Amino acid sequence: MKRLAGTVILSGLLVCGFGQALPEKALAAEVVHKTIVVEKGQTYDGKGKRLIAGPELGDGSQREDQKPIFKVEDGATLKNVVLGAPAADGVHTYGNASINNVVWEDVGEDALTVKSEGSVTINGGSARLAADKIFQINKASTFTVKNFTADQGGKFIRQLGGSTFKAVVNIDNCTITNMKEAIFRTDSSTSSVTMTNTRYSKVGQKWIGVKHATERNNHEF
């Protein structure tokens, strides 16, 4: 582990003082040919490992038939991983899940998709270069993102188009830049978003379809 001017370099993850992580480009990639399952209640600690998807999983485009690099089951934790390009369909969560210091260098179809009901918390990490959305919510859930950096995407968070289930979205201490459409887009009148202590710039309309938004101590720059 190395320290540099307020940062910590840990096996390929450059983690700044706010817990946000950026990748070290020099780290060699390991090719994943079959989805890695983080089983119920278990923790997968990549220790800074950099992974890319093999052709069996997908090419990282917007094709809907791609498979994830990680499947995170109920009560499981994924941490300290860098996902390079191609990232196929990123990470799928099933139930309650913790995602800590995961970096998406070049978002594939999506960075992360909520596939079943639960509470998902993303703490630390970063994502960039998403052709469409970064995070996709497909089931009723509480979805929390904190200490995260996102740059260049269509939407930071998108609830499944046309769905009416309730998603409770919390965004705290994030930096969000260069979104073409919005920070959060939903078609559900029952979903809500709370954003606090967050810096943002060039994010389109900020909210699309959101009926319940709470904002505190944010800064547009």
Swiss-Prot record:
Top EC category: lyase
Places the protein is found: Secreted
Role description: Catalyzes the depolymerization of both polygalacturonate and pectins of methyl esterification degree from 22 to 89%, with an endo mode of action. In contrast to the majority of pectate lyases, displays high activity on highly methylated pectins.
Cofactor binding note of this UniProt entry: Binds 1 Ca(2+) ion per subunit.
Lineage: Bacteria, Bacillati, Bacillota, Bacilli, Bacillales
GO terms, biological process: pectin catabolic process
Matches recorded under PANTHER family: PECTATE LYASE F-RELATED
Pathway(s) served: Glycan metabolism; pectin degradation; 2-dehydro-3-deoxy-D-gluconate from pectin: step 2/5
Keywords: Calcium, Lyase, Metal-binding, Secreted, Signal
EC annotation from Swiss-Prot or TrEMBL: 4.2.2.2, 4.2.2.10
Signal peptide: 1-28
Pfam families, A to Z: Pectate_lyase (PF03211)
One term of GO molecular function: pectate lyase activity
Organism: Bacillus licheniformis (strain ATCC 14580 / DSM 13 / JCM 2505 / CCUG 7422 / NBRC 12200 / NCIMB 9375 / NCTC 10341 / NRRL NRS-1264 / Gibson 46)
Cofactor(s), names only, from the UniProt record: Ca(2+)
Family: Belongs to the polysaccharide lyase 3 family.
Keyword Oxidoreductase set for record: no
Gene Ontology terms: cellular component: extracellular region
Protein name per Swiss-Prot or TrEMBL: Pectate lyase C
Catalytic activity: Eliminative cleavage of (1->4)-alpha-D-galacturonan to give oligosaccharides with 4-deoxy-alpha-D-galact-4-enuronosyl groups at their non-reducing ends; Eliminative cleavage of (1->4)-alpha-D-galacturonan methyl ester to give oligosaccharides with 4-deoxy-6-O-methyl-alpha-D-galact-4-enuronosyl groups at their non-reducing ends
